[in-house]
Amino acid sequence: MATNGENGRHQEVGHKSLLQSDALYQYILETSVYPREPEPMKELREITAKHPWNIMTTSADEGQFLSMLLKLINAKNTMEIGVFTGYSLLATAMALPDDGKILAMDINRDNYEIGLPVIEKAGLAHKIEFKEGPALPVLDQMIEDGKYHGSYDFIFVDADKDNYLNYHKRLIDLVKVGGLIGYDNTLWNGSVVAPPDAPLRKYVRYYRDFVLELNKALAADSRIEICQLPVGDGITLCRRIS
């Protein structure tokens, strides 16, 4: 049973884990995640912790999960929409083979450049093509081009929740049959089951309906198999089957 302190902590919107016990989450981190976390990822995690918007970063346990997943599917050509300081990007770059590629897009290059020295020091910058600006125009151009259809093994989306469905409409053509798309924050701080009068922060309440709409659409999409996991803030994996 959670203590009162743990209950209080989990009422805070910024808490990254959906587990009902802080002690249990810390056990996972300290037993299985931090001891195996590569030094570059630890360095970037500690740098990002000083950022005023550090809640935007991918959690360490989710980074570990993504790394394992990428290796299991032998991913080589990947895309990331929403980079922030690059923790999940670094996890991806470390998991890919030396000739692996990541197209990374974010509207804020300044945040990306916080983590870039760590990525460069790890000898992984050659795997990354970073584009600053909205992702939708880039995706539209790729679809129009034609040669990118079905070319991606894995795509990770951790960006503007109000555009998740717009991303999905395009990404389904760019990921290969058998490839995966991962949508982050699909449990959105647990707000997806919150009652209408729940005390939610404004940004959580604003994006909640978009996340609910996405979850409903993914569940009904016959082109994919899905698996929604309570890792981090919730991640939904979509495997393209047609």
Curated annotation (Swiss-Prot):
InterPro entries linked to this entry: Cation-dep_OMT (IPR050362), SAM-dependent_MTases_sf (IPR029063), SAM_O-MeTrfase (IPR002935)
Species this chain originates from: Nicotiana tabacum
Catalytic activity: (E)-caffeoyl-CoA + S-adenosyl-L-methionine = (E)-feruloyl-CoA + S-adenosyl-L-homocysteine + H(+)
Family: Belongs to the class I-like SAM-binding methyltransferase superfamily. Cation-dependent O-methyltransferase family. CCoAMT subfamily.
Pfam families associated with the record: Methyltransf_3
Function: Methylates caffeoyl-CoA to feruloyl-CoA and 5-hydroxyferuloyl-CoA to sinapoyl-CoA. Plays a role in the synthesis of feruloylated polysaccharides. Involved in the reinforcement of the plant cell wall. Also involved in the responding to wounding or pathogen challenge by the increased formation of cell wall-bound ferulic acid polymers. Also methylates free caffeic and 5-hydroxyferulic acids.
Name of this chain's protein: Caffeoyl-CoA O-methyltransferase 3
Tissue expression: Mostly expressed in the bottom and middle parts of the stems.
Binding residue positions for a divalent metal cation: D158, D184, N185
CDD domains found in the cross-reference section: AdoMet_MTases
EC numbers: 2.1.1.104
GO biological process: lignin biosynthetic process; methylation
Free-text cofactor note: Binds 1 Mg(2+) ion per subunit.
Pathway(s): Aromatic compound metabolism; phenylpropanoid biosynthesis
